[in-house]
């Protein structure tokens, strides 16, 4: 069994005996391509999902005595159901094929052309809308807090390494860390000045926001009915997590929710327009392999 991975090929090839099973999570470091290929000396069987949205899924292969079962397991998304009609559609097709010339030929003939139809594969790196300063960045530092001590440390770092550093800023909002998300505003009073100082020294500042948590204690959770966009367990109750950094109960928001899209887009626009940052880092927008239903 050969698994689509960014790792060295020989590390992702497995002997599959009767009763053997293999599973891989896509997308991940060990599953960077949404395909499985089973081959022997006679040829290769090809199994792939053609999902141009790169939705999270688990690909599995289970060997019986005379057969192999290939399975795609996925937690469904709110975005796959039409809000008007209520119709559910799986947003991809699954394709299979057999190539007598082996797994390399199968991948070149079927998977490679598919990647060129995807957002991540249909443009070269040079043609993508990526600012040059980001491409040129070879050193990032992370700052924690908005204090004179933190700013002094940033200035000292710039003095040593020179201009062009990226400063990844945390703890810039008024509420304690990992609480009241996504209600980041107002920012700490000194933060805009901190951004300006970094930029005057010809460096770039990119603050952190969390892309998945919605604190039920946040004003916006009640005002906007956050529970309607929160992920749920199989029994219908809210899926929640407690981070050791805050020890408060947070709900996890479905990344496909139109409500969450509006919140994140609006937040990013507000951070850049009002605080004049060079960008925004959205952490954990889609993460965690544990099963969740939205």
Residue positions per predicted region:
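Short, solvent-exposed coil/turn linker segments
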Residues: 7-15, 250, 254-255
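Conserved small/polar residues in nucleotide/adenosyl-binding loops
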Residues: 3-4, 8-12, 286-293
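Short, functional N-terminal and low-complexity linear motifs
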Residues: 119-124, 161-164, 231-236, 277-282
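Alpha-helix termination/capping residues and helix-transition junctions
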Residues: 2, 159-162, 265, 273-274
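Conserved structural scaffold segments of CAZyme catalytic domains across common CAZy folds
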Residues: 14-221
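Active-site neighborhood of glycoside hydrolase catalytic domains
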Residues: 256-288, 292-294
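Active-site-adjacent "subsite" loops/lids of carbohydrate-active enzymes
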Residues: 207, 211-270
């Amino acid at each position: 069994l050969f698994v689509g991975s960014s790792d060295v090929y020989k590390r992702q090839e497995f002997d599959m005996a009767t009763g053997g099973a293999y599973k891989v999570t896509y997308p991940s470091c060990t599953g960077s391509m949404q395909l499985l290929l089973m081959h022997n000396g006679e040829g290769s069987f090809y199994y792939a999902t053609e999902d141009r949205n790169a939705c999270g899924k688990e690909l599995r292969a289970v060997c019986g005595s005379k057969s192999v079962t290939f399975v795609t397991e996925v937690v469904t998304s709110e975005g796959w159901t039409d809000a008007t009609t209520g119709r559910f559609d799986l947003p991809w097709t699954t394709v299979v094929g057999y190539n007598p010339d082996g797994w390399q030929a199968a991948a070149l003939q079927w998977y490679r052309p598919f990647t060129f139809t995807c957002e991540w594969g249909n443009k070269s790196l040079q043609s993508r809308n990526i600012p040059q300063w980001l491409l040129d960045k070879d050193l990032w530092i992370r700052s924690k807090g908005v204090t004179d001590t933190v700013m002094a440390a940033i200035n000292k770092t710039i003095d040593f390494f020179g201009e062009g550093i990226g400063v990844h800023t945390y703890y810039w909002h008024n509420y304690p860390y990992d609480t009241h998300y996504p209600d980041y505003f107002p920012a700490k009073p000194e933060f805009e000045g901190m951004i300006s100082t970094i930029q005057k020294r010809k460096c770039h500042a990119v603050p952190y926001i969390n892309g998945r948590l919605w604190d039920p204690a946040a004003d916006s959770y009640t005002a906007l009915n956050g529970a309607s966009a929160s992920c749920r367990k199989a029994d219908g109750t809210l899926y929640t997590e407690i981070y050791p950094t805050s020890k408060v109960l947070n709900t996890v928001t479905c990344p496909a929710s139109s409500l969450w899209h509006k919140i994140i887009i609006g937040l990013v626009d507000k951070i850049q327009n009002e605080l004049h940052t060079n960008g925004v880092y959205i952490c954990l927008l889609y993460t965690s392999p544990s099963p969740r239903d939205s």
